[in-house]
């Protein structure tokens, strides 16, 4: 691995290649792509793996057969694929928006976040929790995979702004405001009931400001 700039440079240089340049074969393209892949820092910005991590007996340090478990990511396959860093998303599907629903969503979200953190501690010889961009490069130099944490769907925030800080302190570094249905933060383009807030809600704007603080 190396620097993302190299991949960008290669891409830009290719755009200016003259039409009479040698056309690469598929084999040559794959070879060059693999060379770039090995040279740059590679990052997967979204994986729903935490849904697996809270299942009894699921171990991220073991290589899983996707045909048997449905698992698409684990630490051995991250190494095999030269994937340097990944965002594990704690996903909570949208449900009832009342105190009980918000409480259940928060509890499930915290459970997934804790499972990610515990997994990085248990496997600290091969992975590490990353909290900023530099951490990925530092962990790469140590021969470790960088594990970032995100939240998919702002539902676990409920109506409590202080939850943003709670999740941040636990290691979360991004939150997608909404998923397949409207919530208290914003409208979803796929909600069958149509828009509720006209986009982002007033509370959703406060959440964004808090995340950027």
Regions found by a protein language model. Give the residues of each.
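Sec-dependent bacterial lipoprotein signal peptides
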Residues: 1-7
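Alpha-helix-loop-beta-strand connector modules within alpha/beta enzyme cores
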Residues: 195-213
């Amino acid at each position: 691995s190396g620097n993302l700039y190299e991949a960008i440079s290669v891409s830009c240089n290719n755009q200016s290649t003259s039409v009479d340049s040698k056309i690469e074969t598929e084999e040559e393209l794959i070879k060059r792509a693999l060379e770039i892949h090995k040279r740059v820092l590679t990052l997967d910005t979204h994986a729903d793996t935490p849904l697996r991590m809270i299942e009894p007996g699921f171990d991220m340090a073991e290589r899983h057969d996707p045909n048997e478990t449905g698992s698409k990511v684990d630490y051995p396959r991250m190494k095999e694929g030269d994937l340097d860093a990944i965002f594990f998303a704690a996903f909570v599907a949208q449900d009832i928006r009342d105190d009980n629903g918000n409480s259940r969503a928060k509890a499930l979200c915290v459970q997934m976040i804790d499972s990610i953190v515990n997994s990085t501690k248990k496997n600290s010889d091969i992975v590490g929790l990353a909290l900023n961009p530099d951490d990925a490069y530092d962990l790469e130099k140590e021969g470790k995979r960088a594990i970032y944490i995100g939240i998919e769907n702002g539902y676990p925030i409920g109506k409590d702004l202080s939850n943003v800080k709670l999740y941040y302190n636990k290691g979360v570094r991004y939150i997608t405001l909404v998923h397949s249905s409207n919530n208290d933060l914003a409208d979803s383009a796929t909600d069958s009931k149509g828009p509720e807030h006209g986009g982002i809600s007033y509370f959703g704007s406060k959440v964004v400001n808090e995340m950027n603080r």
